[in-house]
């Protein structure tokens, strides 16, 4: 037998939101304890800074340019590789409860399994697998889905409609009647995607995901290993946690982020030093992606709005930490407390006021790219607590799950098993990670490639409608941890830039088969 695996993800959570990572707003004792017992990674990077490509990389162990789900709204091919299929073959019971997002949410005809299962009333469905066989959907025996608020025909929305229909209007409407991301403001400050939600905490999707996970775990046998992916939709916008909880973090007492320049002129100068789409989005001249409200202009963001958004975000993080604690207690009650590997991370980050911006997009800086990652191996293995400072990637998760299960990584996995110490990371050449962005929206094409090492963050903009291929960004992380001074054109770093460019080229031209890029089927 291998070991049982609890894989926990959140959506759009920054590295610095956890207490163990220096966060000051949220109390996260459960996750902090897991980090103290296991391995904490100081520089974990996503393969993409948006949901669908990043989540598809966690499942497949491949970069977006390999698995083909290159943008939100582009479904991961139904026969794409899936680590859950390998675990299922190894005898594991497999479940995904919460947010999946391998397929578009905007699917009025129910073309995709993620949007059909709740109405069908079945736990999974048979589909084609990567190796030509047919089996349970993406390798999961059991699926229950949720997303932000009550969007889509998912299990959480069905639960709310059937049991608490009167509470549905309390949630923020993520998409407006024009099918654009809603720009309406709320709360005390009029911040976009904010609403005071009267829903009782026990009906909110964070507790629902934990409750459904606990129920599934209680049904598992002692003589069978399991892999459970528990996936919380928060702290992704909209920021509409239960109103009963918002007093935990009074927004008026929240300090402004260290990377929020209060002066408009300072913000503009910082943005002008980056590639031009930064400033043009800030001014409202372009909408380069669907990841933020199209009708919202970032330059209108006020300091109080930043405070309120960060306060509500912190509340959501606290609720997640408490929900994780409940699930871990249920595991202990089953007698499995020492025999479960727990891995926690998020799919990408959130700007949260950095550079005067909110949300996400083709902006490859730490706010979006530096993620929390904690691996607490089963206590029965007597793990040595450690901190890994070398760069690692979410693309390594699939191989890591299989290693825990006692199985080798398949040939299609592009990521190697996560190192358990800095010495191991160095010995195994964990020296660089890669992040990709491709988008085509509103007639604007943006293509970004980034390599991150221990010392540098280097970005190239490939030719598109916004860039001619000559632009880029280069930050010296030791001197400039906030990525404010772009040294892409600094002659003193010419040799460094050449080395990093060579690493990026190696990533772009790496060997191996790649899926045909998927077709954009929906905005998200």
Regions found by a protein language model. Give the residues of each.
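Formylglycine-dependent sulfatase
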Residues: 1-461, 467-470, 482-502, 521-523
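Residues forming the ATP-binding cleft of Hanks-type serine/threonine protein kinase domains
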Residues: 478
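Short, charged, surface-exposed hinge/linker loops at domain edges
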Residues: 513-524
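A short N-terminal helical cap/helix-turn-helix that marks the beginning
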Residues: 508-509
């Amino acid at each position: 037998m291998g070991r049982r695996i609890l894989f926990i993800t959140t959506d759009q959570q920054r590295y610095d939101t956890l207490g163990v990572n220096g966060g000051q707003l949220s109390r996260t004792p459960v996750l902090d304890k897991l980090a103290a017992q296991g391995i904490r990674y100081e520089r974990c990077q996503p393969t993409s800074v948006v949901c669908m490509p990043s989540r598809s990389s966690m499942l497949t162990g491949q970069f977006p340019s390999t698995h083909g789900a290159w943008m939100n709204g582009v479904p991961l091919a139904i026969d794409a590789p899936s680590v859950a299929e390998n675990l299922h073959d190894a005898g594991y019971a497999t479940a995904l409860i919460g947010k999946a997002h391998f397929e578009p949410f905007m699917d009025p005809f129910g073309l995709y399994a993620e949007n059909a299962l709740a109405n069908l009333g079945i736990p999974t469905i048979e589909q084609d697998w990567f190796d030509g066989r047919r089996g349970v959907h993406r390798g999961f025996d059991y699926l229950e889905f949720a997303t932000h608020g009550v969007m889509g025909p998912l299990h959480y929305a069905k639960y709310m409609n059937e049991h608490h229909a009167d509470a549905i209007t309390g949630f923020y409407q993520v998409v407006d009647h024009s099918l654009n991301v809603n720009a309406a403001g709320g709360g005390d400050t009029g911040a976009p995607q904010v609403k005071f939600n009267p829903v009782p905490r026990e009906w909110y999707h964070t507790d629902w995901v934990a409750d459904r996970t606990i129920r599934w775990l209680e049904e598992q046998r002692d003589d069978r290993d399991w892999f459970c992916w528990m996936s919380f939709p928060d702290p992704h916008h909209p920021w509409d946690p239960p109103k009963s909880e918002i007093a935990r973090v009074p927004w008026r007492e929240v300090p402004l982020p260290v990377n929020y320049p209060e002066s408009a002129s300072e913000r503009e100068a910082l943005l002008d030093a980056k590639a031009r789409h930064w400033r043009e989005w800030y001014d409202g001249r372009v909408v380069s992606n669907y990841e933020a409200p199209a009708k919202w202009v970032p330059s209108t963001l006020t300091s109080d709005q930043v405070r309120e958004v960060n306060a509500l975000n912190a509340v959501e993080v606290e609720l997640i930490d408490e929900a994780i604690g409940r699930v871990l207690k249920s595991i202990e009650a089953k007698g499995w407390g020492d025999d479960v590997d727990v891995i926690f991370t998020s799919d990408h980050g959130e700007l949260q006021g950095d550079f005067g911006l909110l949300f996400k997009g083709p902006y490859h800086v730490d706010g979006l790219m530096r993620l929390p990652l904690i691996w607490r191996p089963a206590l029965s293995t007597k793990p040595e607590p450690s901190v890994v400072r070398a760069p690692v990637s979410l693309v390594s998760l699939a191989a890591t799950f299989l290693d825990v299960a006692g199985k080798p990584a398949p040939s299609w996995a592009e990521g190697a098993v996560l190192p358990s110490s800095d010495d191991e990371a160095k010995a195994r050449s964990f020296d660089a990670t890669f992040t990709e962005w491709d988008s085509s929206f509103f007639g604007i094409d943006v293509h970004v490639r980034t390599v991150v090492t221990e010392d540098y963050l280097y970005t190239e903009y490939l030719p598109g409608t916004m860039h001619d291929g000559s632009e880029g960004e280069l930050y010296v992380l030791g001197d400039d941890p906030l990525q404010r001074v772009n040294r892409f054109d600094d002659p003193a770093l010419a040799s460094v830039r050449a080395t990093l460019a060579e690493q990026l080229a190696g990533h772009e031209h790496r060997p191996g088969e790649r899926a045909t890029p998927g077709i954009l089927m929906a905005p998200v």
